[in-house]
Each structure stands twice: as C-alpha cells, then as structure tokens.
Amino acid sequence: MSTSFENKATNRGVITFTISQDKIKPALDQAFNKIKKDLNAPGFRKGHMPRPVFNQRFGEEVLYEEALNIVLPAAYEGAVAELELDVVAQPKIDVVSMEKGQEWTLTAEVVTKPEVKLGDYKDLTVEVEASKEVTDEEVDAKVERERNNLAELVVKEDAAVEGDTVVIDFVGSVDGVEFDGGKGDNFSLELGSGQFIPGFEEQLVGAKAGDTVEVNVTFPENYQAEDLAGKAAKFVTTVHEVKAKEVPELDDELAKDIDEEVETLDELKAKYRKELEASKEAAYDDALEGAAIELAVENAEIVELPEEMVHDEVHRSVNEFMASMQRQGISPDMYFQLTGTSQEDLHKQHEAEADKRVKTNLVIEAIAKAEGFEASDDEIEKEINDLAAEYSMPVEQVRSLLSADMLKHDIVMKKAVEVITSSAKAK
C-alpha cells in the first residue's frame, strides 16, 4: 500500500492511499458469498450460482461497493498509522479509481489534532476561593438540619404561617374551565417550600382548617405545559388541617437520636466537625486542582481548534447525559416535557462547556507527551482492579469493556494532571 498526505489548511488535509489486489481479492470473495445466497439463475438452485456465471451475467464490478466496505476500515487505519497522523472526527472518503485487476486508489479528507504550544504548567500560583476552615456556625447548621429531620407535624387550631404544612383539596381552572393536572385531594403542602407555582403558597398564609380560599395565580411564561404558560388561573382550595412543625429539644437525648454512636451533644458536634473538615479539605483540593489546570490551559496556545472536535464533544456529552436520565427512568420525551426544553436547547447548554473540555484535554495530552509519560503493564492491571472495586464489577468484565489503549490514555492523563497540581500553590 502506498500513502501520501497533502496539507490543505490548518489541521486539515487529504490522505491518498491504495488498496492492493491481495487485499481486494479476498474482499470480493466475501462480498460474493454474502450476496449469492439470494441469487436465482436458470439451471442452478437458489444460492448456488457459480462465480464465473455471476461475473459473466452481472460483471465483477457489482461486488466492488460491498468489497470496499469490507476492506476500507483496515486500509484507512493502516494509512493513518503509516503517516503517523493524529486524526480526529470522521473522514470523508472518495474513490479515485477502482479498475479490475488493478489496485484501488482512494482519498480521505481528514481533520488532524491541532498543535499545542505549552506554556507554564508547573509551580503555578492560583486563586482558590474555597476554604478549609470549619466554623461553629457550620457545625450548628448541620445539627439543626438533622434536628429538623426529626421534627413532628402537630395539628394546630391557629392560622397557618410560613413553615406550617396545610392539608388541602384544590381545583384549578383557566377562564372557568378545569385543566388536566389542576386537581388534588388531601395534598400536604409546606408553605414557603416553593412546591407550587409562585404566589400560590403565600395566599394560604393566614388560613385555618375549614377555610376555602380562592387562590389566583399566573403560570410562568416558561411553564412546562405550553397550553398553560403565561395564563391566569384560579384554584378553589379547601383547607382540611393546619400542622405546625415541632422540633425536639437541643440536648444530649437529641444527639443520641441522631447518631447512636454518640452520647452527648458535644460528641455529635465534634463528629460533625471532623466530617466537615474532611469534606472541605477535599473540596479545597478539588478547587486548587481545577484552578491549576485552568491556568495551565490559559498559558498554552492551541493552533486553531477544529470545530469538529467541539461538535463531537457536544454529542458525547449530550448522549452521556440522556443515558443518565434514562437510567433514572426518564425518557428523552419526558425530560423535554418536564423541563420545557428541546433537543436543540440541550445541545446549546452543553456547547458552553464543550469547547473548554476539548482544550483542557488537548493541553493535558500535550503535557503527558512532553513529560514522556507511559503506562506500564502493572499500572494497567492496577487501574483495572481499582475500577472493578469502584463499580463493584468482576475484574474480567472491566477488562473486556475497556481496551488497553483506553486504559493507557487514562493513566498518562492522570500523571499529567498530577504534574500540574502537585506543585501548584494557592495565593
């Protein structure tokens, strides 16, 4: 196979490559065997037409397209490898010549990975807004959240105030006509929770059990049900009960109810302080790492980022997001209906970060290359075992899902990130 590459523009060019007859002939045989089972010819049983008869009747050229589909992937990948090109995105393949008995010549318009000119990426000094310090107020707030989780709702006679829970029936209508989803019975609503559309909960403050309140609201313009968006609605609401939240006393008994491993409130606070310190330490390290990587990317120069790389990243990100939604039982149609968005909106949302992620990956890859990082067999094996433990999967299943090249790439990328972050300091 002969190959050549011609630059056409920055990060773009054309590969010309040939496919020899010793590769074409087996591909033609495969193509014939694939289609002959459906062939009928006088004097032959279906699927048993001899190759010479086929060639005489239809011509060998009929097999070329199928044969090319068989032989092309390996031929193209071989040309890319021989030319040592780092290709991104799908190529545009064109046939130059496909003559009987001759080698086939093809071209591939390709986009290549852009050149990265690294700037400073070691000993960086960065701004980190996160703090490692844990305050008494943060500890008290965590105790208070757990205390509220143990609160009980007690029926009261007085009028409802914000924070109370009301048990209601409601019937909604627009222009006097009831609408789907606008009716509820014995619904528990915490006033001030924001569960209902703006303005609804506020109008129930002051209501008592037995009251009927006419709640008038306007649906938001971006409401997910388009037929209701921006429209004025009336909800006839009957209050059955008003319940106040009663929280337990803040004492040692509460501490033991929250966490059976402690005996006193002071012990609970000390435990929460340690947990918060560990959490804030991790958040600080993440913030330092993120800021250092961001600065390393800013310090680098990327020569004309191909738009195809960004488009591919957007599609990858969107597909990953939708797969995550479906694992939660939310179909694409359901997601778009609930959020009042479209496929186009979702792509636009992901475009904002796609450009940044592509640039970041390119710079980290360039650092790994500059540092000469490689992945040993032992490191690959450790990575497989770590992933198996993290996702509770059999080691062999992880090995079958991830190629050695993917694992090597992940390992050297982690090493490059470590180079950036290990020497970074906060201002």
From Swiss-Prot:
GO-annotated biological processes: 'de novo' cotranslational protein folding; cell division; chaperone-mediated protein folding; protein transport; protein unfolding
Cited InterPro entries: PPIase_dom_sf (IPR046357), PPIase_FKBP_dom (IPR001179), Trig_fac (IPR005215), Trigger_fac_C (IPR008880), Trigger_fac_C_sf (IPR037041), Trigger_fac_ribosome-bd_bac (IPR008881), Trigger_fac_ribosome-bd_sf (IPR036611), Trigger_fact/SurA_dom_sf (IPR027304)
Annotated localization: Cytoplasm
Keyword match Cell division: yes
Catalytic reaction list: [protein]-peptidylproline (omega=180) = [protein]-peptidylproline (omega=0)
Keyword terms of this UniProt record: Cell cycle, Cell division, Chaperone, Cytoplasm, Isomerase, Rotamase
GO CC annotation, single: cytoplasm
Isomerase recorded as keyword: yes
E.C. number: 5.2.1.8
Protein name: Trigger factor
Source organism: Streptococcus equi subsp. zooepidemicus (strain H70)
